Every structure is written in C-alpha cells, then in structure tokens.
Curated annotation (Swiss-Prot):
Domain S1-like: start-end pairs: 1-72
Listed HAMAP family: IF_1
SUPFAM superfamilies according to UniProt: Nucleic acid-binding proteins (SSF50249)
Assembly mode: Component of the 30S ribosomal translation pre-initiation complex which assembles on the 30S ribosome in the order IF-2 and IF-3, IF-1 and N-formylmethionyl-tRNA(fMet); mRNA recruitment can occur at any time during PIC assembly.
CDD domains in the record: S1_IF1 (cd04451)
Function: One of the essential components for the initiation of protein synthesis. Stabilizes the binding of IF-2 and IF-3 on the 30S subunit to which N-formylmethionyl-tRNA(fMet) subsequently binds. Helps modulate mRNA selection, yielding the 30S pre-initiation complex (PIC). Upon addition of the 50S ribosomal subunit IF-1, IF-2 and IF-3 are released leaving the mature 70S translation initiation complex.
Protein name: Translation initiation factor IF-1
PANTHER family, A to Z: TRANSLATION INITIATION FACTOR IF-1, CHLOROPLASTIC (PTHR33370:SF1)
SMART domains: S1
Amino acid sequence: MAKEEAIEIEGVILEALPNAQFKVKLENSLEVLAHVSGKIRMHYIRILPGDKVKVQISPYDISKGRITYRYK
C-alpha cells in the first residue's frame, strides 16, 4: 500500500511556540500546529509571526503540519 501524498497549502504564522513550533492560520481559515523542516533549520532561516509560509499537512492528521518554505 502506497503512502498518501501530503497536502501543500499556504498560510500565515500567528505565533511562535517553544521547540521551533508555530501556530499557522491556513488560507482555508484552519489553524494548525506546524514544525520547521530540516532544510529550513539547517540554513538558519528565521520565521517570525506574520510571515507567509507553505505548509505540508498529512491527510491522516490535519491538525499538524511541516513548514517547508517561507515566502520573501
């Protein structure tokens, strides 16, 4: 059985939480808890409240996600 593909959607950072986690409001007005992907962490890209980001969400649990890109 193949693994389901992640859903990619854009959102805005609402607040920064401990352990490199963020509360993100998605463009469909859903709020998710998201952590930073390894590449963003590796390159020391700062993410602040108000930043527009791309989030990957698993189809199995839509309350959690992974931030994969920060728009300039």
